[in-house]
Amino acid sequence: MAVIGGGPAGASAAREAAQRGLSVLLFDHAHPRRKACGGGLPVKGIEWMDAPESSIECEMTSISFTFKSTKLKIPVNKGKMVRRDDWDFYLYNRAKEAGAGHIVERVTSLELEKGFWKINGKHTAKYVIGADGVNGFTRRRLMDRIPREHLFAAGGYYLGIKPTENEVEFILGALPGKEGYLWVFPKSDHYNIGYCFNAGTLGMKEALHKLMEERWPGEFVDRKWKLSETGETVDCKQFGSAIPSYNDS
């Protein structure tokens, strides 16, 4: 089996397959690296992945949902925050420890030959798991282009202010468009702020910058924009029985 993409989904799939006795190759061209992601994990997920305490940044104390001027805040103590680069690298190493082989290269070709998949012209696998994301090679190789109106865009920011409370926030109705939301996740020494919205919405980035300047004055680092599919346009039949697709949401 070959797993293309070594993020949480791909690394976990490779680990499980290796533990069950399968011969596994895990492809990823770069580790570790930061991503536009809040880094929040439920307790069940942390328990299943045997997360070490060193990978936990802080524990959630509350979660809130805000729509325009109305806010609902709920005390909780069952969620934890991780840094995606550290967390991804930990899971990647666990997959290797379980027996998965690792190929440090970008997948650029995938061809089906006599019932086996040929990867980059030199690696062979009976089955392939595509876990390299909506913009990854697997999806682009096996599916048609997804129309922009069926895509959501996501952007992530790191705000250099130490949180005074470990409150996870989800904010709706504060930015242009009818779809999407803004998230605010506390970390040990900064905030992770991001947003998810329909890619066709105009003026989103400018509106977000204005909101951040008003609510969180200070320095922040603009991360690159990423595209993440809504899931509504994916026809699984286009993958074929040998190519499941996974993501990290």
Residue spans of the language-model regions?
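Central beta-strand plus flanking loop segment that forms part of the substrate or channel wall
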Residues: G40, N135, R140-F170, W216, ...
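FAD/FMN-dependent oxidoreductases across multiple families
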Residues: M81, S109, T201-S249
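N-terminal Rossmann-fold NAD(P) dinucleotide-binding loop
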Residues: G10-A11
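Active-site substrate-recognition segment that forms the wall
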Residues: L172-G203
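Conserved beta-strand segments of alpha/beta enzyme cores
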Residues: S23, G101, K224-K226
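Conserved N-terminal helical subregion
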Residues: E47-W48, P52, I56-R141, P147-A153
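Conserved N-terminal glycine-rich FAD pyrophosphate-binding loop of Rossmann-like flavoproteins
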Residues: A30-S54
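Glycine-rich FAD pyrophosphate-binding loop
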Residues: A2, G6, R15-C37
